């Protein structure tokens, strides 16, 4: 195996304590696979990030007036009425009981209804002029109204949040006895395990939602509780994935290498096989979940997918987009090795490609959160250090992924205790001033949700080797660990 960078895998043991009754206290938690990137190590002069060009085609060809038939002048109202009459007559005379337009509308409404947006489905049908004369559209709308009225409001405080790191594709490469094996075994999940987990959770009635469904920001800037309406028996949950940068140290260890858009416009992963062959497919959380929801649209609430918690020091989504790759200043050894192995590396092209993937992902229901630029521990870092770090995130990551109001703390750390954030909390006030309103730590409790007039806060549960091996009972509400455990995972899983 290749030589690894010393200290890049860092593990932090986490515990969730109950203090004063039922109040969870989050302490340092088992959340990370990458060490903090020091600010001093990667200072650079910065990089201009290309704005994505939107091209519009204007292909208006003027026809020769002599080739056009003579026009008969008709008042606008008369023309409009005539067109409406012609449309209705054409619909009435159609031999097909359901016109192609009606079929399209019914399909669109059905998709919305499958993801519990019954109001949207009804609007699609009722807002079309065909609705008044279409029995099929009226019947569908009536059915959706009945389903909407049967929905119940789910208690927000009982919504769990689960998270993963990059999935292991090839266990023989990840668990090969080198210095990284222990960290992978503790904090990673295999592709096989992930697929089994989501299938079981789907069968139990779980449905993906977003923190933005749980709490909404009002026009006056205050925050209030959202309302999640689902059929009786459905269980909303939030899913996130940390560090989807495909760090250099993971090369050759059985993980995907980047996210790409395939010929069908779908987000897939590139994966480099042991023989060097590069293949494209479902090799990590994003494409696996996308494919699953295509088959099971009712696993998603209003089109929601998951949240990617992103650092920036090695770039994003597998693209080497940090400014250091352009300026060549203060490079780490793995960055130097990458640039040496890729002498034709084009930074601007890399940034443009990453932006294209991020845009497609957001359009498809995915969201992005800051994980701090350098994977900082927000508990032990000073406010000044976090400010410096966040400036880098805003400079090198936000222009690619877009602005975000969510921060998912690295190492499962936090900037306050279980009682909540206050105005004298310098770290909180800074993040709030930069637009962050949704905050997530790591907590072993089944639920930890705080919603105030200023912020949303939620604890996350790690579904990894460590948690499955040592605390399988803590995951019983989601699945039976014995049904998902990958037998190729070495045991015992190392303690933290």
Task: Please name every model-derived segment.
Residues 2-26:
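Sec-dependent N-terminal signal peptides of Gram-positive bacterial secreted proteins and lipoproteins
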Residues 105, 194, 353-354, 424:
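Amphipathic coiled-coil/heptad-repeat helices and related helical stalk/stem segments
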Residues 157-177, 181, 221-223, 230-237, ...:
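Metal-dependent polysaccharide deacetylase catalytic core of the NodB/CE4 family, i.e.
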Residues 212-213:
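A short beta-strand-loop structural module common to alpha/beta enzyme folds
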């Amino acid at each position: 195996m290749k030589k690894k960078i010393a200290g890049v895998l860092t593990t932090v043991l986490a515990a969730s304590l109950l203090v004063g009754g039922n109040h969870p206290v989050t302490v340092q938690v088992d959340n990370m696979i990458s060490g903090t990137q020091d600010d001093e190590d990667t200072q650079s002069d910065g990089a201009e990030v290309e704005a994505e060009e939107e091209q519009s085609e204007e292909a208006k060809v003027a026809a020769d007036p002599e080739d056009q038939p003579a026009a008969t002048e008709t008042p606008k109202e008369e023309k409009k009425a005539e067109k409406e009459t012609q449309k209705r007559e054409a619909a009435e005379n159609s031999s097909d009981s359901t016109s192609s337009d009606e079929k399209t509308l019914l399909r669109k409404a059905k998709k919305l209804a499958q993801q519990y947006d019954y109001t949207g489905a009804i609007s699609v049908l009722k807002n079309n002029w065909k609705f008044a004369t279409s029995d099929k559209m009226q019947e569908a709308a009536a059915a959706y109204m009945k389903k909407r009225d049967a929905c119940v409001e789910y208690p927000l405080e009982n919504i769990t949040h689960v998270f993963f790191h990059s999935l292991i594709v090839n266990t023989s490469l990840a668990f090969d006895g080198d210095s990284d094996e222990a960290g992978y075994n503790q904090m990673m999940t295999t592709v096989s395990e992930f697929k089994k987990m989501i299938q079981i959770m789907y069968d139990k009635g779980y449905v993906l939602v977003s923190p933005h469904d749980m709490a909404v920001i009002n026009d006056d800037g205050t925050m209030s509780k959202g309302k999640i309406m689902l059929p009786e028996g459905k269980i909303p949950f939030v899913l996130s994935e940390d560090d989807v940068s495909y760090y250099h140290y993971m090369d050759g260890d059985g993980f995907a290498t980047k996210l790409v858009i395939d010929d069908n416009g779908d987000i897939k992963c590139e994966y480099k096989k042991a023989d060097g062959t590069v293949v494209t497919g479902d090799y990590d959380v994003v494409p696996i979940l996308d494919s699953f929801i295509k088959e099971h649209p009712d696993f998603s609430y209003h089109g929601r997918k998951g949240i990617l918690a992103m650092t920036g020091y090695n770039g994003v989504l597998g693209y080497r987009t940090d400014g250091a790759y352009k300026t060549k200043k203060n490079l780490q050894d793995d960055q130097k090795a990458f640039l040496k192995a890729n002498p034709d590396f084009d930074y601007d092209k890399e940034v443009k490609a990453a932006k294209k993937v991020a845009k497609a992902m957001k359009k498809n229901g995915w969201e992005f959160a800051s994980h701090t630029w350098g994977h900082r521990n927000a508990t032990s870092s000073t406010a000044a250090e976090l400010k410096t770090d966040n400036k880098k995130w805003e400079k090198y990551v936000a222009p690619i992924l877009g602005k975000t109001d969510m921060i998912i703390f690295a190492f499962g750390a936090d900037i306050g205790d279980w009682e909540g954030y206050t105005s004298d909390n310098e770290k909180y006030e800074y993040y709030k001033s930069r637009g962050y309103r949704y905050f997530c730590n790591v907590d072993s409790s089944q639920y930890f949700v705080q919603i105030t007039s200023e912020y949303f806060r939620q604890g996350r549960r790690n579904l990894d080797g460590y948690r499955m091996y040592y605390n399988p009972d803590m995951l019983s509400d989601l699945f039976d660990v014995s049904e998902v455990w990958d037998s190729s995972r070495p045991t015992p899983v190392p303690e933290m």
